[in-house]
């Protein structure tokens, strides 16, 4: 119930419009706060330890300290896991009725700012998306809005987060439509637009008019189209590597039960990687700024491997190593207790991919009239990786165009993003955010039918008003139970309430009046075995397949040890399906 709702007399649609504006402002402030905290921490630590980043051995320890602080905060203060923010927002929509715990309105900002501020090799985008989603969800719950409005407001918060941190309102809307709320209707666009615009205005007001990736672009030339095709294919290959390597590393490290041993291993590994490859420090956006403006990234005095940058052919090799190792540094940061996302690393890897392709082509064409604009390829590569890793080509195209002012590169952005998306899709059906959710059968899709089945839970449709009998009860006892029941199915249990089968009224109709056999016939003489069982925690999609295979109208619900729970029926499921479909599709 809402504690205080001064606009409760308004229609829910009007309440939603007002709240979307408020959510946008609040999330915009949260995005500014996160960026400011990260910047202050990084500058303060740099001043405290002095010198250039990679020139100090202290930076071997700094990222690990940040990871430890974030881990202790999550373990002992909020006592919750808050990593993988975008994935958790998706889970909130599909499995938790769009409800997110109140502490997520601030905890992700606190933990991620420490993680990244100390040099953790992750992005700030996913934590702020989860923060925004939590703000939208809790505002809606506080105001007593419906599930549908709560879901839209959750999306408004996520969209505002992207818009606020990148100053890209259109990209924020597209992010929600492509990645987060697959089944949102077009009439929900106005709240999304209001929230993204208000968040962007807040960001511009407090942080100035500069965009995150200001760059010097070269006018697009049609003769370079074949090279953008090559870039698209390369980005697709990098996307597949990014998704598969990340998930496999997380699974392998996740098997370690001792969190402190896990932290030590990840902290040492991350420290060594950053010491050898300084661009892996933090989000890496400073290095991207250098590449986007066509400048050479100076590594002298920063790393023992600086000599690799002195030979022309060593430069693309060095950056290729950075590209490959960014996935490791990101995963080590998250697995070791840090809080951050894959959004920023995706942009980083995409930029490096674009640079490697452009620099390699320029070296191959050395001495010819052909010249590949490296800064253009850096920018377009960012879109290519986003399209592949996130499976969101529209978001990739418009985000890169908005944050760079690179609308002149629309054609190569579209071309590269489409090819990267298509290449990745051939091998990986799901994005890095949705793969694990899809494997558990919890992913909402654009298919309304599948979305409703995902939202339905077996626990919502279980019927428990069936009179049970024991397997060794007599016919007389069975007739007594039948006379007191309004059902025509009677579950049969053993002595410890494990389901054995069922008796139908039709099975005993002819024997009900044969009183002379009341003590000689028993329940097991009439019992039928169930063709299939339904488990309490089973996905509704699986349940419907069992109904289809068996042609049954009712199926028993049991726990994993076959303890009887109840029955589910087609009629109850269809009724719940209609009700849920109305909620999902209403405007």
Region annotations inferred by a language model:
Residues 1-455, 459-465, 469-490, 494-500, ...:
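Alpha-helical transmembrane segments and immediately membrane-proximal extracytoplasmic
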Residues 191, 463, 510-514, 528, ...:
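Phosphate-coordinating loops and pocket residues in cytosolic domains that bind phosphorylated ligands
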Residues 469-486, 493, 512-515, 519, ...:
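The conserved cystathionine-beta-synthase
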Residues 499-502, 563-567:
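Glycine-rich acetyl-CoA-binding "A-motif" of GNAT/NAT acetyltransferases
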Residues 505, 520-523:
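Nucleotide-binding motor/catalytic cores of P-loop/tubulin-like NTPases across gene-expression machines
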Residues 507, 525, 569-572:
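Ca2+-coordinating acidic residues in Ca2+-binding motifs
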């Amino acid at each position: 119930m809402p504690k205080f709702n001064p606009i409760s007399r308004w229609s829910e649609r009007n309440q939603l419009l007002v709240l979307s504006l408020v959510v946008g402002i609040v999330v915009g402030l949260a995005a500014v706060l996160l960026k400011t905290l990260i910047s202050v921490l990084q500058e303060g630590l740099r001043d405290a330890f002095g010198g250039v980043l990679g020139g100090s051995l202290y930076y071997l320890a700094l990222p690990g300290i940040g990871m430890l602080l974030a881990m202790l905060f999550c373990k002992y203060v909020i006592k919750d896991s808050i990593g993988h923010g975008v994935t958790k927002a998706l889970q909130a929509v599909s499995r938790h009725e769009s409800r997110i715990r109140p502490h997520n309105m601030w905890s992700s900002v606190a933990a991620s700012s420490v993680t990244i501020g100390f040099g953790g090799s992750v992005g700030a985008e996913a934590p702020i998306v989860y923060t925004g989603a939590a703000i939208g969800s809790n505002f809606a719950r506080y105001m007593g809005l419906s599930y549908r409005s709560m879901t839209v407001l959750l999306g408004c918060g996520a969209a505002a987060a992207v818009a606020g941190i990148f100053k890209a309102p259109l990209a924020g809307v597209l992010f929600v439509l492509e990645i987060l709320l697959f089944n949102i209707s077009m009439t929900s666009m106005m709240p999304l637009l209001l929230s993204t615009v208000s968040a962007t205005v807040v960001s511009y007001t407090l942080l100035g008019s500069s965009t995150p990736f200001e760059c010097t672009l070269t006018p697009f030339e049609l003769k370079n189209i074949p090279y953008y095709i090559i870039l698209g294919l390369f980005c697709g290959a990098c996307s597949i590597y990014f998704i598969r390597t990340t998930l496999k590393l997380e699974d392998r490290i996740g098997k370690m039960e001792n969190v402190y041993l896990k932290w030590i291993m990840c902290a040492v590994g991350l420290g060594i990687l950053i010491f050898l490859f300084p661009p892996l420090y933090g989000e890496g956006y400073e290095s991207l700024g250098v590449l986007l403006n066509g400048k050479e990234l100076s590594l002298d005095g920063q790393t023992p491997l600086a000599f690799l940058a002195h030979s022309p052919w060593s430069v693309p090799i060095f950056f290729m190593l950075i590209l490959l190792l960014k996935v490791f540094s990101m995963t080590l940061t998250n697995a070791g207790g840090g809080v951050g996302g894959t959004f920023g690393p995706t942009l980083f890897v995409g930029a490096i991919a674009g640079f490697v392709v452009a620099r390699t082509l320029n070296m191959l064409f050395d001495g010819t009239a052909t010249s590949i604009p490296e800064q253009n390829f850096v920018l377009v590569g960012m879109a290519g990786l986003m399209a592949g890793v996130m499976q969101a080509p529209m978001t990739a195209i418009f985000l890169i165009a908005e944050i760079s002012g690179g609308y002149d590169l629309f054609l190569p952005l579209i071309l590269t993003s489409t090819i990267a998306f298509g290449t990745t899709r051939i091998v990986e059906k799901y994005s890095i955010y949705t793969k694990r959710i899809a494997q558990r059968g919890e992913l909402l899709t654009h298919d309304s039918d599948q979305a409703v089945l995902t939202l339905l839970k077996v626990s919502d449709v279980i019927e428990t008003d069936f009179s049970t009998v024991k397997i060794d009860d007599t016919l007389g006892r069975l007739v007594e139970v039948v006379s007191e029941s309004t059902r025509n199915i009677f579950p049969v249990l053993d002595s410890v309430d494990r389901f054995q089968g069922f008796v139908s009224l039709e099975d005993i109709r002819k024997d009900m009046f044969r009183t002379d056999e009341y003590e000689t016939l028993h329940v097991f003489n009439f019992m039928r075995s169930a063709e299939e069982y339904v488990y309490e925690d089973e996905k509704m999609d699986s349940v419907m397949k069992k109904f289809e295979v068996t042609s049954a109208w009712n199926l028993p619900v049991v726990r994993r040890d076959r303890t009887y729970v109840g029955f589910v029926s087609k009629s109850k499921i269809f009724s719940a399906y209609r009700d849920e479909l109305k909620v999902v599709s209403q405007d």
